[in-house]
Amino acid sequence: MALYDLAHQLAREIKNSDEYTRYKELKDKIMSNEATKSMLLDFQKQQINIQSKQINGQTITDEEKEKFENIKELINLNSDIKEYLDAEYRMGVLFNDIQKILFGGLEIGITENEKSTR
């Protein structure tokens, strides 16, 4: 079987998995409620803003920290968003595990050990 065929088969298996099915159900539920959708999108926007500032070494103001903490508290009280974020996290773990399996035995790039031997 060709590698691309295997990749397509893996994609189908993921799409039919319990994890993905649950994630999709929760996402659809969030997207069908404008208030919940807006709250999630605001949370994600603030999260990206703070992470971006951290990565770039910029200062996060007290106001930004407080605003983010407030929305995090609201998110934790909203079971739909909390379940969705948990499912999204589990999908991320699944993809990371699959990536480790796929690339774990491959020698791609130059290792630190190979760099030091001349």
Curated annotation (Swiss-Prot):
InterPro entries: Com_YlbF, YheA/YmcA-like_dom_sf. Gene3D superfamilies: YheA/YmcA-like. SUPFAM superfamilies: YheA/YmcA-like. Belongs to the UPF0342 family. This is UPF0342 protein Hore_03100. It comes from Halothermothrix orenii (strain H 168 / OCM 544 / DSM 9562).
